[in-house]
């Protein structure tokens, strides 16, 4: 009897841990869908190109502002961007926008989307 109730308790705790872990999955795990990104961009959300100034000058999405990924947190703070502002980030491949997004989420920004790479976005348009 004791073994059975102990086993049931362990199973319950494990099930609770799985549910908790699933709810804490990063928001960027299923992102980088160009169609979703374009829907957001077309709605006029804040669009940030996190590539270098040189890459930005070579071409960018209309309406995007350029903030290199390693400056994203202090620059948004300087601009007084609220932490619930809807923000779409992109770079060349999706890696730097992922790093920028993680930095923003860590600082409490709750409405960010990693749109992935510039070329993928342009080809999907």
PLM-predicted stretches and their roles:
Residues 90:
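Short, surface-exposed ligand- or partner-binding patches at beta-edge/loop junctions that are enriched
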Residues 2-45, 54-86, 95-125:
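Rhodanese-like catalytic fold shared by cysteine-dependent sulfurtransferases
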Residues 48-49:
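Structural scaffold elements adjacent to functional motifs in cytosolic proteins
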